[in-house]
């Protein structure tokens, strides 16, 4: 079944066993409110790692039932990241979430060669799933958070992650637009040349399971009228 909205995604997840979510440094209202809503929706069981006194106070001030969370006390945000990652490694949690700590501390724990989460040689990237009222389907994009200037090998990995997520959402043959500043293939513009190469690799079966085209501009990828013009 293809999932075309975030509501449909939520309903699908509700029908499955709850995942165990661990949050690194859950010391703020926004984080605890979001996690509380996920617990209430029946999506996750929550472990929140942070300053227990602060988290308890936030729950009291914002009317959040403390019993929805398993609280793990640590003194610092860096320690929270390390502890949360360790819980995933040990099989005590299934999902990792960033709370109110800096991205560099969060990533440092994930990428730690001895105690992190990545296999040797693996590429860490980012995939986001979005809903737009003017578009009938979910939009899946990457990488917009982790790798600011990906090299070709990283772009190929990102494309693979996008396809994997799309298929998990029920898209049998995902259509992937590789974006660039120019829709012409310009050797001096690496983004356009890389996009063309990824497209050709898909044509030749080196990238499987998706229709890939590029280089493309964002408007042409999303709007049929723009593409026609």
Question: Where are each of the predicted segments found?
Answer:
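Anion-binding alpha/beta catalytic cores of soluble intermediary-metabolism enzymes, centered on
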Residues: 1-47, 51-229
């Amino acid at each position: 079944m293809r999932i075309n909205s975030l509501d449909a995604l939520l309903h699908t997840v509700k029908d499955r066993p709850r995942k165990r979510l661990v949050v690194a440094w859950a010391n703020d209202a926004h984080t605890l409110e979001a996690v509380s809503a996920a617990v209430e929706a029946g999506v996750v069981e929550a472990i929140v790692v942070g300053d227990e006194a602060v988290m308890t106070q936030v729950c009291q001030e914002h009317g959040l039932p403390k019993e929805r969370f398993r609280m793990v006390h640590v003194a610092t945000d860096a320690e929270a990241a390390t502890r949360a990652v360790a819980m995933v490694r040990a099989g005590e949690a299934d999902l990792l979430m960033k709370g109110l700590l800096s991205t560099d501390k969060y990533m440092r724990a994930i990428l730690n060669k001895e105690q992190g989460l990545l296999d040797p040689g693996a590429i860490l990237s980012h995939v986001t799933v979005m809903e737009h009222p003017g578009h009938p389907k979910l939009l899946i994009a990457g990488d917009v958070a982790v790798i600011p200037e990906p090299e070709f090998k990283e772009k190929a990995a990102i494309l693979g992650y996008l396809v994997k997520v799309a298929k998990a959402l029920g898209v049998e043959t995902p259509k992937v637009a590789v974006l660039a500043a120019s829709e012409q293939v310009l050797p001096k513009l690496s983004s356009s040349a890389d996009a063309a190469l990824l497209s050709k690799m898909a044509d030749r079966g080196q990238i499987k399971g998706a229709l890939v085209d590029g280089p493309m501009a964002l408007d042409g990828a999303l709007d049929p009228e723009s593409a026609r013009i």
